Amino acid sequence: MAALSLKGIRKSYDGKQHVLHGIDVEIADGEFVVLVGPSGCGKSTLLRMIAGLETVTDGEIAIGDRVVNALEPKDRDIAMVFQNYALYPHMTVAQNMGYGLKIRGIERATIDSRVAAAAKILELEPLLARRPRELSGGQRQRVAMGRAIVREPSVFLFDEPLSNLDAKLRVQMRLEIQRLHARLATTSVYVTHDQIEAMTLAQRVIVMNRGYAEQIGAPVDVYEKPETVFVAGFIGSPAMNLMHGRLSEDGATFAVAGGGPALPVAGAPGIGTTIATGRDWVLGVRPEHMTPQPGVAQASLPVDSCELLGADNLAHGRWGNHDVVVRLPHADRPARGTALGAALPAHRLHFFDPETGKRAG
């Protein structure tokens, strides 16, 4: 195991336009970090640079006490798990898991021992004699993880490993990856576009956008205190409600742009200090914080539709030219055309600068 250091990492393919812009992060020995963001944000490129599959234009990558910029992937002491399982169809599970060690010249007894240990961890022991075509998608992904485990690397790299699995298997494999990390405590970097994977697996999340690390922090901190409009809108399902508008001179109301209502926002932390009154802002509030509750300021939301999700419902409406979503308990399902008293708890309101996109306060 080893710490992983990324200092000033930049990537350009043509020497002019950069696709990664000065990524700086220190990943502790044994830490599980998730790179999350939309397609094209640079997360997979960064992972490939750590692996040695892409060159570093500027900056330094260190694994443990070794700078690895100039090292081949095989010399970096890393193991990768890919979206595609990349199993040899003519080999058994045991042969697939041990093949990487075999071509490195590791003695047979050591290979057998490591394969047996990994198979026990991943509950693959009954499947060792089978070939990939005889396995389910989840079993194949466990074999791919087993192949990485037997290398006993300093760093695990996961490149969207659950993307090919159905929803039920993704939940199962997330739990298995959590248990695996708890048992092995190996430094891990995991790439995904799925925020649920990011929030449930990570000790720290790096939210990527257009080649920048928009925010780095514990999942709960990123969720509860997003630093930019992008993070606020990307993390969370459904996303945070974001509304452009103007804060009144007395800081008591927020007039939603596009003919929306004047929302009661008095008492929100920072108003009058870090949040200047009498100017434009982007107001954010999460759907679950708008659930009607006694003693909390409310605003009327005309309901356009209501989605039944099982344990709860999502009521949809509009304020001005902004779509608004409110999460409701299972028993509350307002009909189309009715008015919902959407809560606006002052301590749950977020304000962002409309020009820079950065959080106020």
Swiss-Prot record:
Functional description taken from the UniProt entry: Part of the ABC transporter complex UgpBAEC involved in sn-glycerol-3-phosphate (G3P) import. Responsible for energy coupling to the transport system.
Membrane topology category: Peripheral membrane protein
Catalytic function, reaction form: sn-glycerol 3-phosphate(out) + ATP + H2O = sn-glycerol 3-phosphate(in) + ADP + phosphate + H(+)
Assembly: The complex is composed of two ATP-binding proteins (UgpC), two transmembrane proteins (UgpA and UgpE) and a solute-binding protein (UgpB).
Intrachain disulfide bonds: none
The protein's Enzyme Commission number: 7.6.2.10
Keywords: ATP-binding, Cell inner membrane, Cell membrane, Membrane, Nucleotide-binding, Sugar transport, Translocase, Transport
UniProt record similarity statement: Belongs to the ABC transporter superfamily. sn-glycerol-3-phosphate importer (TC 3.A.1.1.3) family.
UniProt entry tagged with the keyword Cell inner membrane: yes
GO MF annotations, alphabetized: ABC-type glycerol-3-phosphate transporter activity; ATP binding; ATP hydrolysis activity
Cited Pfam families: ABC_tran (PF00005), OB_MalK (PF17912)
Phylogenetic lineage: Bacteria, Pseudomonadati, Pseudomonadota, Betaproteobacteria, Burkholderiales
Name of the protein in its database record: sn-glycerol-3-phosphate import ATP-binding protein UgpC
Residue ranges of every copy of the ABC transporter domain listed in the record: 4-235
Range of residues in the leader sequence: none
Location in the cell: Cell inner membrane
Cited PANTHER family: MALTODEXTRIN IMPORT ATP-BINDING PROTEIN MSMX, SN-GLYCEROL-3-PHOSPHATE IMPORT ATP-BINDING PROTEIN UGPC
GO cellular-component term (any): ATP-binding cassette (ABC) transporter complex, substrate-binding subunit-containing
Record carries keyword Translocase: yes
InterPro entries cross-referenced by the UniProt entry: AAA+_ATPase (IPR003593), ABC_transporter-like_ATP-bd (IPR003439), ABC_transporter-like_CS (IPR017871), ABC_transpr_MalK-like (IPR015855), ABC_transpr_MalK/UgpC-like (IPR047641), Mo/tungstate-bd_C_term_dom (IPR008995), NA-bd_OB-fold (IPR012340), OB_MalK-like (IPR040582)
Biological processes, Gene Ontology terms: carbohydrate transport; glycerophosphodiester transmembrane transport
Organism: Burkholderia ambifaria (strain ATCC BAA-244 / DSM 16087 / CCUG 44356 / LMG 19182 / AMMD) (Burkholderia cepacia (strain AMMD))
Binding, ATP: G37, P38, S39, G40, C41, G42, K43, S44
Primary localization: membrane
Cited SMART domains: AAA
